[in-house]
Amino acid sequence: MNIKQIQRNKDVINECEDLEYLDKFDSYPVFMGCVNQPIKDDILIDMQWGISKNSGIIQLSSLLPLDVLYSEDHGAGVVGTMWLDHHKEFAKFIQKQSPQSILEIGGSHGILSREYKKMNDIDWTILEPNPVPAADVDAVFIKGFFDDKFIFNGEIDAIVHSH
């Protein structure tokens, strides 16, 4: 598969056009997760890193289009008690801010919303390219990306992103 990468020419922090080539990982797998296909069908890409001479920040200098990077759910935040504990603690932190409505960016399964709503039942919307709602999740899901094309017409007073 021939994928056209997007070249980053500016530092993501200060927008200086001073990225200097640092290193490259050849033939790096695009998808992070379990698959049902043979390894020969994996999508591989050269992962290239650069460093900003001004800020010292190391960052990807070649980017994948979002629809390739997030072509399917990778299960982050779903497996294991450590993730469940993370969502419960993050929900407690959010509650201290007393939001009335939340937009969650990338909440694939909705577990954070479910755990929060056990304490306070509020409007919760999740923007996710590959929604896979867990049991007992009643959040509203919007299939999509948080990019320059995204427009949210609802009312929110908090935006969260859990990982």
What are these regions (language model features)?
Residues M1-M82:
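N-terminal juxtadomain amphipathic helix
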Residues I45-M47, A76-G77, D85, P129, ...:
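Glycine-rich loops and low-complexity Gly/Arg-rich segments
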Residues M82-E89, F93:
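A gly/proline- and charged-residue-enriched helix-loop-helix capping module
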Residues A91-H163:
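Conserved SAM-binding loop
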